[in-house]
């Protein structure tokens, strides 16, 4: 390969990376606007696990803050769960290198989970509850007004199917929620972002990823089964994931079976109901989004290239 070829290839990689970054910025910005996730004067506590999703969340929020029409603070928080072999130095070194306020919370949730959960059983449920309580407490201590989590579009769809298959509910992850005691607001700014985009972005940025030895590496999890099912659908039927996500944004209560959402009992002959679709059970295919948008860089490799960011953060 000649020097000219190398230069052209580098330019192409850089162009595609910048395009990927802009798409993530746009998706996060749209989610923030659609659900009023961040407001003037907010102090946003970004929960940083050391995985690709939370790194990307922090990076994009820092980028967006530079040109945001409102002022808000960001503080990164990591929960050190005292897992054996956990590289405690990685996150502090990274956060110091980019100049972000941060707090490392040390709690031996690993020991609690191992004590309470029999060997071979899934630890996710207990681990999640313990983490949630600690993060809520930490947000109060820091004076944070919003807690930002790194769940993305694929996580939301996986949760939808998990609840349908195993819980008997049509329920997903909300992009924004209020805690049971009403004291905390949790936001998911990556709600519109695809996991494939996040993975490519994290690889391109060379984030120092820390694997989870509690839950992420456990085999045969129900979530992993659902994830593989969705990935297979995505390969076989391009656009299906986009259509499914569109579906949870377009709910028609009159065409489901939940009597709490729609008053079926009082329907009478001759009634004319506004904004009710009547006997139309299946929308015409041409009205359903069937293909992803702006994905012509889908197969690009951004690993070994000098990057030019839209906004470089130091």
Curated annotation (Swiss-Prot):
Binding site for [4Fe-4S] cluster: 124, 127, 215
Intrachain disulfide bonds: none
Subcellular location: Cytoplasm
Keyword annotations from UniProtKB, A to Z: 4Fe-4S, ATP-binding, Cytoplasm, Iron, Iron-sulfur, Magnesium, Metal-binding, Nucleotide-binding, RNA-binding, Transferase, tRNA processing, tRNA-binding
Recorded catalytic activity of this chain's protein: cytidine(32) in tRNA + S-sulfanyl-L-cysteinyl-[cysteine desulfurase] + AH2 + ATP = 2-thiocytidine(32) in tRNA + L-cysteinyl-[cysteine desulfurase] + A + AMP + diphosphate + H(+)
GO BP terms, alphabetized: tRNA thio-modification
Motif (PP-loop motif): 49-54
Cited Gene3D superfamilies: HUPs
Principal location: cytoplasm
CDD domains listed in its UniProt record: TtcA-like (cd24138)
Molecular-function annotations in GO: 4 iron, 4 sulfur cluster binding; ATP binding; magnesium ion binding; sulfurtransferase activity; tRNA binding
EC number(s) stated in the UniProt entry for this protein: 2.8.1.-
Any one Gene Ontology cellular component term annotated for this protein: cytoplasm
Cofactor binding mode and count: Binds 1 [4Fe-4S] cluster per subunit. The cluster is chelated by three Cys residues, the fourth Fe has a free coordination site that may bind a sulfur atom transferred from the persulfide of IscS.
Pathway: tRNA modification
Domain of life: Bacteria
This protein's record includes keyword ATP-binding: yes
Cofactor: Mg(2+); [4Fe-4S] cluster
Note, other: The thiolation reaction likely consists of two steps: a first activation step by ATP to form an adenylated intermediate of the target base of tRNA, and a second nucleophilic substitution step of the sulfur (S) atom supplied by the hydrosulfide attached to the Fe-S cluster.
Complex and partners: Homodimer.
Family: Belongs to the TtcA family.
Function summary: Catalyzes the ATP-dependent 2-thiolation of cytidine in position 32 of tRNA, to form 2-thiocytidine (s(2)C32). The sulfur atoms are provided by the cysteine/cysteine desulfurase (IscS) system.
This protein's name: tRNA-cytidine(32) 2-sulfurtransferase
Organism: Pasteurella multocida (strain Pm70)
Protein encoded by which gene: ttcA
């Amino acid at each position: 390969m000649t020097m000219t070829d190398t230069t052209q290839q580098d330019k192409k990689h850089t162009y595609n990376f910048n395009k990927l970054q802009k798409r993530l910025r746009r998706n996060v910005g749209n989610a923030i606007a659609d659900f009023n996730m961040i407001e003037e004067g907010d102090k946003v506590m970004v929960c940083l696990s050391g995985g690709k999703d939370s790194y990307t969340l922090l990076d994009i929020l820092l980028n967006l803050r530079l040109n945001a029409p409102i002022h808000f603070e960001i503080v990164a928080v990591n929960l050190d769960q005292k897992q054996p072999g956990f590289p405690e130095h990685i996150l502090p070194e990274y956060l110091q290198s980019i100049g972000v306020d941060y707090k490392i919370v040390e709690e031996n949730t690993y020991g609690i989970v191992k004590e309470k959960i029999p060997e071979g059983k899934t630890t996710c449920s207990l681990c999640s509850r313990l983490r949630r309580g600690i993060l809520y407490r930490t947000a109060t201590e820091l004076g944070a007004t919003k807690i930002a989590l790194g769940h993305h579009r694929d996580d939301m769809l996986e949760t939808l199917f998990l609840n349908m298959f195993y819980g008997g509910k049509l329920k997903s992850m909300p992009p924004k929620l209020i805690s049971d005691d009403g004291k905390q607001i949790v936001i998911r700014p990556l709600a519109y972002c695809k996991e494939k985009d996040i993975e490519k972005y994290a690889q391109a940025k060379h984030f120092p990823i820390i694997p989870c030895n509690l839950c992420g590496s456990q085999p045969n999890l129900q979530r992993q089964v659902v994830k593989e099912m969705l990935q297979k659908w995505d390969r076989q039927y391009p656009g299906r994931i986009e259509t499914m996500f569109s579906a949870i944004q377009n709910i028609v209560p009159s065409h489901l079976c939940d009597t709490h959402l729609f008053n079926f009992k009082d329907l009478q002959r001759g009634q004319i109901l506004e904004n009710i679709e009547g006997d139309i059970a299946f929308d015409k295919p041409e009205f359903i989004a069937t293909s992803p948008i702006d994905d012509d860089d889908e197969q690009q490799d951004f690993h070994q290239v000098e990057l030019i960011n839209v906004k470089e953060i130091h």
